[in-house]
């Protein structure tokens, strides 16, 4: 989890590195192609619109499972990771602008959408068209309904039904995010079939081409060649990597809790991973609640106590603090890991401190008021 100014840029870099690693393993392009002409900054980072943030002294270092990337002095270097096992992820980037997909009808016909949003739109459209029944949303006991005949989305409950573009701003932010993540979760876990397409045939051709390149590369030792061949040949996505900007967007605190619980439930299955960015102290504190619930669950052996525990944090949303990292960014852009206690993030953090500062300022106002009455 990341919070404070600059967090989105870091999330976008992480998404870019993760996709590049996957693309190299899959054989979309060669290392030589990637490292020439400053393509990393000018081409691949422009996808996330962060190319203008680069400076002459920009230094980036990413260590993945299959490759290690270093950007320094405007040069991009790629090194294979020997001995590591690479599992191919289904990468889903959920941008903060996602509510546009709810507000604008026929969004697929709009030109010049930001590329991450356009990619999300493609998955969102596929999810809607493959929807066999209404999707239960995690807040307010409502469902997402897609009318395939008229190509319109609705929010409905037991006593009302409204078009998504007329629903609350919270619903407009929540719905596309939840529809996309639920669909991709089911694709990865094989709950819904993956549609075969011309793209999948092209992908097979790229894999065969990549295998041929590996076999011809005399610079690789036998072990490196074996690992790269295994990674390239396994073309299925093994887990869901969800990168979500501001899941709390336009939502009341109690709804933020339900959203976080749902996101954590997706993460609790298999090797799924989740990266969140947030401005919300509620998200951070509800995360601490989920970690504490996991700790308490190891001590509970009474059925009534277990029911009380699950009423606070559902079993699927409880998470081991050892699997969680929280980072805050200071005013200079320095990234700092938040200290933890029993796996829970420290409450001495920027978001909570801002709440405390607000209380202090209010107390100062009361003091001024009292002095006026003296």
Regions found by a protein language model. Give the residues of each.
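Short, well-ordered strand-loop elements centered on a beta-strand within folded domains, enriched
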Residues: 74-82, 154, 332-342
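Short, solvent-exposed coil/turn segments
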Residues: 87, 148, 157-160, 237
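Switch/communication elements of ASCE P-loop NTPase nucleotide-binding domains
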Residues: 1-22, 159-371
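P-loop NTPase switch/coupling surface
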Residues: 1-151, 229-230, 269-271, 284-285, ...
